[in-house]
Regions:
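Conserved ABC transporter NBD signature motif
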Residues: 65-77, 369-377
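Conserved catalytic motifs of ABC-family nucleotide-binding domains
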Residues: 174, 472
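Conserved ABC ATPase signature
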Residues: 152-157, 161, 451-455, 459
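A short, surface-exposed alpha-helical micro-motif characterized by mixed small hydrophobic
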Residues: 220-222, 518-520
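ABC ATPase "signature
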Residues: 238-239, 247, 533-537
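Conserved ABC ATPase "signature" region
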Residues: 129-148, 428-446, 555-556
């Protein structure tokens, strides 16, 4: 019988040099990828997904890692090849798309230059043939205006365009295996859907095998023929995608399917991996009666924040002699925010969500319109006058990695705003307050002296939340606060935000591109597109009967 396997991984083990074999980072990993097959490798951060991918390309540092087992690619054991033999395989036969295209692309070279460089290094083509090949691939990844695109630098194109460029780069040498390591994690759900469809189409047209790595099981199910579930360096379950969804055996697999917010029902609390795995979760559905009662309570009082006809534009200029273009970021925005409400702002990147948040915080000044907070017109205040209101309006950032100062420990990060406003000055009181805040966000006093690099993504975001609530604000703006996190960690952070809202009666402005998350969290939503509010209202009603095509597009993009 003919062997149809392109890649066979047999009993792969990876452990740190000088460590015990009993503490393997990858433990007895075995799987196959057939020719023209898409295999999904799914697990949480730290499960060993990326380590497996790097092992396949033999990119692990021999001084740091020891590997054993076999990785057979076209019947050659990759772990036994020389450097010259490996270099012939990397890029030519096995290619890789990375999670963060901005860090994978060279910021000092334009897109065309980077594509040409790869062709000259790996392919025996003349200049005309190289240009022809690049133009063909750019069309295949569905990018427009090729001539101008090739002149641009990475910072001048969107996240979705960067990822398409990365896909084009990965296909330049006609590989037979494409490893896609979290290629859609940082993207809007609509762009995510487009990239998934693009990979599916290219897999067929280019006769590719694909190893698609992700933390999102619902997303991988839409793409993969076979799914492998990995946890703590070991494979816990694998099988055909549809069978695995319908007949998952391992509690961990079932938990991965359950943590994403439901499109159909609203739960008081999202299931978490830990509770599902320990059979310790009982779903409590928010009934229509209870929801109506809660909404009546919120909207029976006057709003605490009112925005009237806010407009904001930016001037862009491509060169010294080019004419100025005006980009309208916000156009006649009107909204009311009520005490105890969670108001959702949802839309794709560039729709104006974050610009609106910045105008509320007076980081950006609007050109016209009013922002009234508890009777005070914020747009008329000077920077000094606004300081006392900044205590009341706090922000949780999207990226927990860049929002914390790497040189400051957790304790100092949390108490910094408290010291600035001189709420507490005694050192013992400040430390006690930091401990209280850590406990509020589900962390212990053991974290006080840790630095950001010693924390996981979820822990970093909890520290960011602790800092945001340290001043007892009235309004908290959550700007894509969970979009950089695994779906499993997302569920924990969303539960935490709702718990804190109940405890302290916070009012949230919840910004997201993911309508399923917004539906779970919000009492009311505004759908934004190109600086305009397309649609607004009760998210449950909008989900059932959206009025605008753009809203339908966002709903259809949910995995």
């Amino acid at each position: 019988m003919k062997n149809n396997n392109l890649l066979t991984v047999k009993k792969l083990e990876v452990y740190l040099t000088n460590s015990l074999k009993s503490s393997a980072l990858l433990n007895n990993i075995s799987f196959q990828i057939s020719k023209n097959q898409i295999v999904g490798l799914v697990g949480e951060s730290g499960s060993g997904k990326s380590l497996t991918a790097l092992s396949i390309l033999n990119l692990l540092n021999n001084k740091t890692y020891n590997s054993s087992g076999e990785i057979l690619f076209n019947n050659k054991n990759i772990l036994e090849l020389s450097l010259n033999e490996l270099q012939k395989i990397r890029g030519n036969d096995i290619s890789m798309i990375f999670q963060e295209p901005m860090s994978a692309l060279n910021p000092t070279m334009n897109i065309g230059g980077q594509l040409i460089e790869i062709c000259k290094r790996h392919l025996d083509l003349n200049d005309d043939e190289i240009i022809k090949k690049i133009n063909l691939l750019i069309k295949k990844v569905r990018l427009d205006d090729i001539k101008n695109l090739l002149k641009k630098y990475p910072h001048e194109i969107s996240g979705g365009q960067k990822q398409r460029v990365m896909i084009a780069m990965s296909l330049l040498c006609n590989p037979s295996l494409l490893i896609a390591d979290e290629p859609t994690t940082a993207l809007d759900v609509t762009v995510q859907k487009e990239i998934i469809q693009l990979i599916k189409d290219l897999q067929k047209s280019e006769n590719l095998s694909v190893l698609f790595i992700s933390h999102d099981l619902a997303l991988v199910r839409k793409l993969a023929d076979k799914i492998i579930i990995i946890k703590e360096g070991s494979i816990v379950e694998e099988g055909p995608a549809n069978n695995l969804f319908e007949k998952a055996k391992d509690p961990y697999t079932k938990a991965l399917f359950s943590v994403r917010p439901s499109k159909k029902i609203r739960l008081e609390e999202l299931p978490t991996i830990e509770k599902m795995h320990n059979n310790n979760f009982a779903a409590k559905i928010v009934t229509a009666k209870n929801r109506k009662k809660g909404r009546e309570k919120i909207y029976s009082k006057p709003p605490i924040l009112t925005i009237v006809n806010i407009n904001k534009s930016y001037i862009s200029k491509l060169g010294i002699f080019s004419k100025e273009d005006q980009f309208k970021a916000l156009q006649k925005i009107n909204l009311e925010l009520y005490e105890g409400e969670t108001l959702g702002l949802v839309g794709e990147s560039g729709c104006g969500k974050t610009t609106l948040a910045k105008t509320i915080l007076q980081i950006e000044k609007s050109e016209s319109g009013s922002i009234i907070y508890k009777g005070t017109e914020l747009t008329k205040l000077s920077s000094n006058e606004f300081k006392k209101f900044r205590r009341d309006i706090q922000l949780i950032f999207q990226d927990p990695y860049s929002s914390l100062n790497p040189k400051i420990n957790v304790c100092d990060t949390i108490i910094e705003p408290i010291k600035y406003y001189k709420i507490l000055t005694n050192k013992k009181d400040l430390i006690n307050r930091a401990i209280e805040l850590l406990e509020d966000v589900g962390l212990t006093s053991e974290f006080l002296r840790r630095y950001p690099h010693e924390l996981s993504g979820g822990q970093r975001q909890r520290v960011g939340i602790a800092r945001a609530i340290s001043l007892n604000p009235k309004i908290i703006i959550c700007d894509e606060a969970v979009s950089a996190l695994d779906v499993s960690v997302q569920a924990q952070v969303l539960n935490l935000l709702n718990k804190l809202k109940t405890k302290y009666n916070f009012t949230y402005i919840f910004i997201s591109h993911d309508l399923s998350v917004v539906k779970h969290m919000c009492d009311n939503i505004l759908v934004m597109n190109k600086g305009l509010i397309e649609e607004s209202g009760d998210p449950d009603k909008i989900f059932v009967k959206p009025k605008k095509k753009y809203t339908k597009k966002l709903i259809q993009a949910i995995p």
